[in-house]
Structures are given as structure tokens and as C-alpha cells.
Design a protein with these regions (language model features):
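ATP-dependent carboxylate activation and anion-phosphoryl transfer catalytic cores
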Residues: 82-148
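Short, histidine-centered active-site or binding-site loop motifs used for metal coordination
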Residues: 1-2, 122
Length: 148
């Protein structure tokens, strides 16, 4: 839960290593388990939410032989849109985040499903979004705070 950029992720199978999991819990004090979605090999979508509104998304595709879509793990970003289901999920989450006074977040969707965590401390991908779309969401965020 404190990790970022695809770090501290274990892929467990039916033959998972109990000692490996025990060491992980001992080191980090907790473990979050998420169902593996096979379609991750086709990429995930990082959705950017600013002040409760969906502002855009990028598709992140893992490098060959990897299950991690993170750019820092070798994933590649592509321009993308959101389908109705993805937009609905993202909008609902955005409203909830705004109620909790979280003004900037990134959520990750695979095949239309939220994969578990909401990135509020490290919602990366803005440089790639700007490169692909020309839109500067970082500037939009800071301008939207009205700190002048």
C-alpha cells in the first residue's frame, strides 16, 4: 500500500511461497490481495481525476514478458479514451474523492474493472499524457486550486 511504480508486487500462484509472503508481511506489516486479470497483458488505463472530474486517461501496455504496465517498469503509454463503463466507474470514484477532499488522483482500470487501489500519493503519467494529447493536466490542477 505504500509502494508505487509497480514496486513491491508479488504474483502468487497456487504454488505460492509461504515464506516469501511471510517475509513480505513482516517487512511491510500488511498485504493487499488483488485478483489477477489476464487482460493486463493488453494494458491498463490510468485515469486522471482532478477536483472530482475525469480529465483524461492513458493506456499503459507492459513490455514483452511483463505483467506490469507501469511506465517505470518498462510499460509504454498510448493515447486512449474511456468507454461508458470506465467513465461511469471513474466518475463515481471522482465524486467520492472530492467528498474526501482528495483533489488529484489516478485510478487504474483493466478491462473496465478498478484493479484495487486509488493512487493519491503518486498518480504518475502526466508527462506521458501531455506528450500524447498536448494537454497539461498538472497546470490545470494547480490553476484550479486558485492559489494566486
Amino acid at each position: 500500500l505504500d509502494g508505487y511504480a509497480g514496486k513491491n508486487i508479488l504474483f502468487l500462484t497456487k504454488k505460492f511461497s509461504k515464506p516469501k509472503v511471510s517475509l513480505f508481511i513482516k517487512k511491510y506489516n500488511y498485504l493487499m490481495v488483488q485478483k489477477y486479470l489476464n487482460k493486463v497483458k493488453f494494458g491498463d488505463k490510468r485515469v486522471f481525476i482532478i477536483k472530482g472530474k475525469v480529465k483524461g486517461a492513458i493506456k499503459r501496455v507492459p513490455r514483452a514478458g511483463s505483467n506490469l504496465s507501469n511506465i517505470s517498469q518498462g510499460g509504454t503509454a498510448f493515447k486512449t479514451g474511456l468507454n461508458k463503463k470506465e467513465l461511469k466507474i471513474s466518475s463515481l470514484i471522482g465524486k467520492s474523492l472530492l467528498k474526501d477532499k482528495i483533489y488529484f488522483a489516478g485510478i487504474d482500470l483493466i478491462d473496465g474493472y478498478l484493479i484495487g487501489d486509488i493512487n493519491v500519493t503518486s498518480p504518475t503519467g502526466l508527462p506521458q499524457f501531455k506528450d500524447l494529447t498536448g494537454k497539461n493536466l498538472a497546470k490545470d490542477f494547480w490553476d484550479g486550486l486558485g492559489l494566486k
